[in-house]
């Protein structure tokens, strides 16, 4: 399934039904009173969060959503039927923003949480509404009101508790595949991962914790370079970031600094998040070098650095223990 995490759509609520002019036509009642009914309310457009959805793909080609109009009133003071509401299901974690003003209209983070965006127009009044002592046979009526029109941007921000970040080829996909049942594409070249991968990791108590493998960031990602800018939003909701560093990289210290700089430039509190620094691929370097680079990373980051091998599944218990302590 294609991963789409942003969509611009137009939401049009239904028009209210018109009121009508009608008079009672009954046997032996030659001059019946006004009986024109009111029009029905126009349908509204309502967004509902659904845990079963992971993408905004449904809105890639469906850019205009229109709710049903209300029906006109009927004789004998019958009100017209209301227009059916249009229900749009979106993934949990979808933020809705008004394109014209930039104002956030809502943020649907819980299953079945709903938000009414475009409200249907009110139905018009039939002539029975205008009956008065001064006017016993009114012929006035009103048309239904137009429904609201909103142009909004839907933006999906994944609800993972733990985000795995790092430069391309740091081993993020391998790590999430051994920690969970996720099966991302894994290969020994940069940008294998083109979309965020999600995996549920079980805690000791049996409860699940959602991890997200974020596609490789590169220098300039916060400014739109490479793939990273498109996916940095997905770590905004995480509680912890696992910063994975390739121990066989030409300069692991420089790699660490690149990601830190991108988090700082992107802003939105990313640099303030709890971070665990993880040196991966320990099996590919000798012990002396590993000790040296670990010490330098700890001095640079002012944090404890964990050393692991995703492919050999070494050091993962210590890593998860550290994660559980911080959630």
Curated annotation (Swiss-Prot):
Q: List the disulfide bonds.
A: none
Domain of life here?
A: Bacteria
Q: Where is the Obg domain?
A: 1-159
Per its UniProt record, what SUPFAM superfamilies does this chain match? Obg GTP-binding protein N-terminal domain, P-loop containing nucleoside triphosphate hydrolases
- List the Pfam families: GTP1_OBG, MMR_HSR1
Q: Which residue numbers delimit the OBG-type G domain?
A: 160-327
The keyword Metal-binding is annotated on this UniProt entry:
yes
Q: What is its EC number?
A: 3.6.5.-
Which residues does the record give as ATP binding sites?
Answer: 166-173, 191-195, 213-216, 280-283, 309-311
The keyword Hydrolase is assigned to this record = yes
Q: Which residues bind Mg(2+)?
A: 173, 193
The protein's UniProt keywords, in alphabetical order, are: ATP-binding, Cytoplasm, GTP-binding, Hydrolase, Magnesium, Metal-binding, Nucleotide-binding
Specify where it is mainly localized: cytoplasm
Recorded hits in InterPro entries, A to Z, give: G_OBG, GTP-bd, GTP-bd_Obg/CgtA, GTP1_OBG_dom, GTP1_OBG_dom_sf, OBG_GTPase, P-loop_NTPase
Q: Name any GO cellular component annotation.
A: cytoplasm
What are its cofactors? Mg(2+)
List GO molecular-function terms, semicolon-separated: ATP binding; GTP binding; GTPase activity; magnesium ion binding
Localization, per the record, is: Cytoplasm
Q: Alphabetically, which GO biological process terms does the record hold?
A: ribosome biogenesis
Family from the record: Belongs to the TRAFAC class OBG-HflX-like GTPase superfamily. OBG GTPase family.
Explain the purpose of this protein.
An essential GTPase which binds GTP, GDP and possibly (p)ppGpp with moderate affinity, with high nucleotide exchange rates and a fairly low GTP hydrolysis rate. Plays a role in control of the cell cycle, stress response, ribosome biogenesis and in those bacteria that undergo differentiation, in morphogenesis control.
Q: What does the subunit comment say?
A: Monomer.
Record protein name field:
GTPase Obg
Taxonomy of origin reads: Bacteria, Bacillati, Cyanobacteriota, Cyanophyceae, Synechococcales
Gene behind this protein:
obg
